[in-house]
Amino acid sequence: MAFSGKYEFESEKNYDEFMKRLGLPGDVIERGRNFKIITEVQQDGQDFTWSQSYSGGNIMSNKFTIGKECEMQTMGGKKFKATVKMEGGKVVAEFPNYHQTSEVVGDKLVEISTIGDVTYERVSKRLA
């Protein structure tokens, strides 16, 4: 499957500006900058399990089926309902405060999150 794999954080753009726009306090933004994030994606057709492990042992995991409403949670643990879509090979989700697209480009997982005119990009390299 196109998305299945384990990915390790490699680089990011506009982290500070995006996190400030989310309303996170400075100390939380600073701590998050040093996180080593491992993303693991399991894809079975239209069904996904998308997990992110953060330094310190915190894990966020969302299960969803493309085109069907599901309950998801944000990095902060807030639960919300969303319908995840597939558009042009990209997984597209509307989080409560931002729009996110994810795609695999070569051996990289590229995640783009947008709030208004601020775009955050996180790139992770495939480990397995």
UniProtKB/Swiss-Prot annotation:
Single GO molecular function: lipid binding
GO biological process, alphabetically ordered: bile acid metabolic process; lipid transport
Membrane topology, from the record: Peripheral membrane protein
Domain of life (superkingdom): Eukaryota
Membrane among keywords: yes
Cell compartments where the protein resides: Cytoplasm; Membrane
Chief site of localization: cytoplasm
Keywords annotated in UniProt: Acetylation, Cytoplasm, Lipid transport, Lipid-binding, Membrane, Transport
Expression across tissues: Expressed in ovary granulosa and luteal cells.
Any matching Pfam family: Lipocalin_7
Gene3D superfamilies: 2.40.128.20
N-acetylalanine: modified positions: 2
GO CC, alphabetical: cytoplasm; membrane
InterPro entries linked to this entry: Calycin, Fatty_acid-bd, ILBP
Keyword Transport: yes
Stretches assigned to coiled coil: none
Domain comment in the entry: Forms a beta-barrel structure that accommodates hydrophobic ligands in its interior. Can bind at least two ligands per molecule, however, the stoichiometry is debated.
Known role: Binds to bile acids and is involved in enterohepatic bile acid metabolism. Required for efficient apical to basolateral transport of conjugated bile acids in ileal enterocytes. Stimulates gastric acid and pepsinogen secretion.
Family as reported in the entry's similarity comment: Belongs to the calycin superfamily. Fatty-acid binding protein (FABP) family.
Protein name: Gastrotropin
